[in-house]
């Protein structure tokens, strides 16, 4: 297990990666390498301003080593998947979720998000880029939380560096190996029958007469008028 992840200076930077151990990144979160900025974010009451401030934080791709910040630029999977839990109505609910996550045998780490209103959880998975999304789908079912963010499944998903001196780490966490592949519903496309050109003049007239009669009716003697 490589346990090497990728850090970009911020979310705007996509092509200058730094590769560090996951331990290094979690140590930064615990010690507060971005403490001052995170505290500003948590004090900011305007959501738009918070989002702008977050763009200045280091951006971490926990799931591997990347040349650039996109899925196709992966060099090697780290053996980690980062999950988001957010949208809690109260701090009490968030604390209850955190307690539940720290007791889960598959959870490697849990820490508070930069906003202070959500949680990030790291889970160890096999180093299989092609199965990354399937592990994500299985973990969604496993945690069965209404606060689970379903949009964070792509392998190069960014996690902003946070600050949490009480970060939970369990280096003996178990490896998650179950996968769930989403069912694809085959949609039957009804196609019109191919049109066969009619070249016989009499046949054309016959078809037109039938159509006219059905639509408008015909008085005796009109056909040859």
List where the protein language model places each region.
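Catalytic "initiation/cleavage/transfer" segments centered on a nucleophilic residue
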Residues: 2-13, 17-20, 28-33, 143-193
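Modules that initiate DNA replication and primer synthesis
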Residues: 5, 31-39, 43, 72-103, ...
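DNA replication initiation on ssDNA origins
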Residues: 1-79
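Short, glycine/charge-rich beta-strand/loop segments that flank catalytic centers
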Residues: 63-65, 114-116, 155
């Amino acid at each position: 297990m490589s346990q090497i992840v990728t850090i970009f200076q911020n979310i705007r930077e996509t092509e200058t990666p730094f590769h560090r151990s996951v331990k290094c990144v979690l140590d930064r979160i615990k010690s507060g390498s971005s403490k001052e900025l995170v505290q500003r974010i948590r004090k900011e009451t305007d959501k738009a301003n918070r989002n702008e401030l977050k763009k200045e934080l280091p951006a971490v791709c926990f799931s591997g080593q990347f040349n650039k910040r996109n899925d196709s630029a992966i060099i090697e999977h780290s053996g980690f998947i980062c999950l988001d839990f957010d949208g809690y109505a109260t701090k009490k609910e968030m604390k209850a979720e955190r307690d539940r996550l720290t007791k889960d045998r598959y959870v490697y780490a849990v820490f508070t998000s930069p906003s202070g209103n959500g949680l990030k959880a790291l889970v160890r998975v096999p180093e299989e880029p092609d199965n990354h999304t399937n592990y994500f789908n299985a973990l969604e079912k496993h945690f069965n939380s209404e606060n689970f963010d379903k949009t964070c499944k792509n392998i190069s998903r960014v996690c902003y560096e946070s600050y949490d001196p009480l970060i939970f780490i369990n280096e003996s966490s178990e490896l998650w190996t179950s996968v769930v592949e989403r069912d694809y519903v085959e949609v039957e496309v009804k196609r019109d029958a191919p049109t066969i050109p009619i070249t016989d003049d009499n046949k054309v007239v016959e078809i037109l007469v039938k159509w006219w009669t059905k639509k408008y009716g015909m008085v005796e003697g009109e056909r040859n008028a």
